[in-house]
Amino acid sequence: MKKTFYHYMMKHRAALFRNEISDLAEAMYDDLSFPKQSEDYDEISSYLELSGMLESMSIFDEAWDLYIQDR
């Protein structure tokens, strides 16, 4: 069974050394409206852009690349 992007990102929460990806994971965890069941790049990207959760979408792109590599 494939992990959703949200499920994948939860392993980055409470990282020993904070970085932009661990900060994104924390923000996703705190956002009750985040599309937790989605595996769709466009859906998640649009949500993040509209929510203003990130200063730069390159953080999401980096996290998404790691997610794809891990699948």
From Swiss-Prot:
It comes from the Bacteria. Coiled coil: none annotated. InterPro entries: UPF0346, YozE_SAM-like, YozE_SAM-like_sf. This is UPF0346 protein BC_2253. Belongs to the UPF0346 family. SUPFAM superfamilies: YozE-like. Disulfide bonds: none annotated. Pfam families: YozE_SAM_like. The lineage of its organism: Bacteria, Bacillati, Bacillota, Bacilli, Bacillales.
